[in-house]
Amino acid sequence: MLRILLAEDDDSMRVYLVRALERVGYHVTAVDRGTEAIPLLEAEPFDLLLTDIVMPEMDGIELAQKAAAIAPDIRVMFITGFAAVALKAGRKAPEAKVLSKPFHLRDLVAEVERMFLTEDQHGRL
């Protein structure tokens, strides 16, 4: 079972994503800010960091950079309504998928599955 760490500051979106991802069989741990995700990344293995970009205290890009330093094999997917603006700021983000809000749940699930299907085909899991 894939383990997903979700960092999303919008309460309703976070609850919705947790329920939906768990319903299709993923184990999801959710936090409402990037600073809460760091100790979890240090303590537990996760397959995917699913993070909003615009969050208080630590944005998703900084979180992804720190996650890559802590767990180099973790995959990253950004979910945001501000993808174009946030990623044009000239900051280096780890290789990641970007899913722009609003999105349909099936699109999110398909992207997660595609990320790990590619790895399975290349023998990385």
In which residue ranges do the predicted regions lie?
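Two-component/phosphorelay signaling modules centered on CheY-like receiver
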Residues: D10-T29, A96
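Acidic, metal-coordinating helix/loop segments flanking the phosphotransfer/catalytic sites
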Residues: V18, A30-L48
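C-terminal output helix
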Residues: V18, F103-F116, D120-R124
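Conserved phosphotransfer cores of two-component systems
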Residues: Y26, E42-E44, K66-I74, V85-P94
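Acidic catalytic/metal-coordinating carboxylates
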Residues: R33-E36, D59-L63
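Active-site residues of response regulator receiver
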Residues: D52
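Receiver (REC) domain active-site loop signature in two-component systems and cognate sites
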Residues: M55
